[in-house]
């Protein structure tokens, strides 16, 4: 149960050109395209690409370049790369395109600061994804626990989970239930709850069980007690609990591959 179809993609660096910029709620949506994306694929809701932005002081774009058919050559010197969920991969008159939703911040880093002033014709470099893992097709229920950084991934789960799976969304951190519901507007039915207090208490009230698939992502320290509750107290398997710390408060350029709980890693 909870098997996810896995697909490997050609891993390379691609030069991207901005073809559109718009505001979507709390996000700047940037549409990227370019000849390098003819074979670009992203078929899993937890996919991420590494996007390289210009140096905010000099404007220079230092980034990896493609190494022949596959792989990348990394440059000497500091780069400004951040991970994002690719959205709405599609073929257009201008070629294959996809969207990045960049969350606005009151104290923006390189990505958010760039997005505030992004213009059609601007260039970035995109690396990945290496592969995809699809949404499980046999879950009776899905619980998506998200803050503003992981809301785009939740939208992909809503698209990819079968209609037979009932879906609850639990918004935490600075993300309100109303904002989550507005962003996730979908043709399928789903319920949104807001974690006004302790995240474990809120999750306990939603009663995840043996038939529930859980995706939880966002601020890492907030997710640590939730992971202990799901994995240790409830005994849910690693296959049915997919959890990722997209960022950690007080840490710059946090590695989302790091374990949520370093004292109890999978």
Name each model feature, range by range.
Residues 1-266:
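Extended, composition-driven regions rather than compact fold-specific motifs
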